Each structure stands twice: as C-alpha cells, then as structure tokens.
Amino acid sequence: MIGTKPRVGNFRRHWRHARAAATALASLLLAACAQVWYATVGSADSAHDLAIRRGIVFDAEHALKLDVYAPHAAAGAPVVVFFYGGSWEAGRRRWYRYVGEALASQGLVVVIPDYRKFPDVRFPEFMSDAANATKWTFAHAAEFGGDARRIFVAGHSAGGHIAALLACDKRYLAKFDLTPRDLAGMIGLAGAYAFLPYVEDEAEIFGDDAAGRYDSQPINFVDGDEPPMLLLQGLADDEVTPNNAEAMAERAQAMDGTAVLKLYRDTDHGDLLVALARGRAGQPPVMRDILDFVAKPPARSSLLPSGEGTPQGRMREKPGSLQ
C-alpha cells in the first residue's frame, strides 16, 4: 500500500456528533462567505446570463438531486461535475451555488449533485451516488449545451477524494457502463488522496480492515490509465496537507500518467474556493488554472512548461512530478 503522512487538523474530533456539527457549520460558513463575495465582486451580469436548473432528481430511490448551471445558448461546452466537501459527513449542493455560477459564467456547464453521507451510509455507498450522477451527466449533458466528450469530474476536499476515486478506480463507473477514460479529466482542489493512518471517524466511514484502508486511498489506483489530473493545493493548508497532492502527482509520474500540480503559497484549505468565487488580483489563479486545463488537457506524458511565480502562489508543472 502506498502511504503518506497525512493532513487533517480540523477533521479530528473527540465525538462523532460534535465533529459532524462542526464540519457542517464550517462548510456552511465557507459557502455563505464565498457566495456573498461572489455576488459582491463577481461579474455583475453573470447570473443573468446563465440557465439554471435546480432540484433535478437523478436517483429517485435515494431521493438524490442535482443542480445544473449553464451559459445561455451554450453549445458543445465543456462540462464539470463538481462534488463538494465536508468530511464525507456534511454539505448540501445549494451551499455551492457560487461554484456553479462562477464556472458557468466562464462558459462551462456545471453539475453539482448531492450524495449520501456518513453516518447514514459508509464507503463505498457515496461513491455509487457519485458515479450515478456522472452517468446522468453523460446522458443529459447535451440538453444543457454540454459536450459529453468533454466531461470532467472535480471536487474540493472530501469531494476531491470522490472525484479522484471516480477517475482512478475503474469499479465505480463500471457499474454504470462507463470507464475513467470516458472522462476528459479530473480536477482536485485540496483533495484527500493519501490520508492514512485514519483519524477518528475515518475508520468508521471507510472500514479499518486491510481492504477498506486500501480501497479508500485514490493514490493506490493510479496506474497511468486514468484521465489527466489537475491537482490544486494550498501550501498553508493544515486540513488536507500538500503532501496529498504531491504524492498523487509523483505516483502519476511513476506510472507514466499525467498530473498537473499547482501549489499556491499562503493559501489554506478554504482559500481555493474563495479564490474561485472572487477571482481578484493577489489571490491564487484557481479559475485561470482550471480554465486552461479544461480548454486543453495535457496529453499523457507530455512535458509542460515549468511553473511561473505569482504574488500568492508558486506553481510546479510537469506531468506527475515536481520541478
């Protein structure tokens, strides 16, 4: 098994319910703040130029719904399926409206699904929900002006973990007659890719036997056959520490895969989403980096230009490695 010394500051809680409540509150506050910032400093007419459909049922059995954000009159647009974080325990799709609006205002079709969470379900049940939402997206992307040949899975924190497993572990999409290579790419924002040993509830969420520990780690399934990966990570993140993204990129290089690693100085766990919402000077160029990747995902094993410095970030670019 591939192991890295993990991250997780605030994921550690003494009591399950206190931890879940704190996670939910933190997720809600982050989402609320970013939404206010986006509404204040974002494009004044961005939301008015969007076609938004909320509450679409994609899994009637489990009452799961998703929201779609698309530019008006979109045609052949790239599609991003975004999975929000919350320690696999908290979060709601409506809290991340600002993510949908921000990305859609840049020409992308965005799908934000809900998924079941602990303690209602344990791993891998929420992975089945994520794969099901992805299958729905393939079937319906064209209805919203999206291109089913250019569907990316993305996520922040625990959502980045979910997106990475969809892209790397073939079993989840296979249940819905898809493969990871049907995806155009994976975009992880401070994703948890290599987080053993577990802390607190993680053993209950994923299972503390050998199979559960192995299957929970996206890094174990990087074999060079996954789609290109964009790994965005703040160097000041003490919840999901940078060695998650660094180890994932190094593993991709070792397996002759493609991972573009972007490391941002003075950026913590929530700053990536705030930067995505605000996009102001002096913040890490999260939106620009996502748009560049979506516009032209790097070919497998192709050498990318070395990273450039920015006031808030230093970026190391090379498929699956550091420079």
Predicted feature descriptions by range:
Residues V36-A73:
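N-terminal cap/lid segment of alpha/beta-hydrolase-fold proteins
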Residues D45, E61, G191-F221, P227:
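Mobile cap/lid helix-loop segments that gate and shape the active-site cleft of serine hydrolases
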Residues G76-G85:
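Short beta-strand element of the alpha/beta-hydrolase
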Residues R94-V111:
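Short amphipathic alpha-helix adjacent to the substrate-entry channel of hydrolases
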Residues R122-A141:
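Alpha/beta-hydrolase active-site loop
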Residues F138-E200:
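Primarily recognizes the serine-hydrolase "nucleophile elbow" in alpha/beta-hydrolase
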Residues L231-Q233, D237:
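Short beta-strand/loop motif that positions the catalytic acidic residue
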Residues M255-S301:
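C-terminal catalytic histidine-bearing segment of alpha/beta-hydrolase fold enzymes
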